[in-house]
């Protein structure tokens, strides 16, 4: 039996949570998630041409369904591009969970792809702090279920 990847665990969690749509734009740091989503019978991946469109669509979907929406982006410019839609949802207390891809951990600090060297490596999630209740970087797969539970609870808790 093959070992499950973190992306498979994440999709399994989202399915159990009742997520039926996930908005995003493909990028090199979310290929594993796209692969796992392609095997899901319960979650429809809605690909957009820009991350700002993905976060705005997720905002609209949450407004209609009254459930937390999920947007997925890749690191670097993908993460910066979702901020407008995330901020718009946050200002109106619309529940949204953002999942941002990252390079494989064995590349940390080696500067492949699109690491942003503003203050320190691996701190890109901090860009979302001003426009959302909480942001995390998950470095330990054991913490993933706890962090996901907390993210959805916070998103759905109103202001």
Q: Which residues fall in each region the model found?
A:
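N-terminal alpha/beta PP-like core and its mobile active-site loop of ThDP/TPP-dependent enzymes
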Residues: 1-159
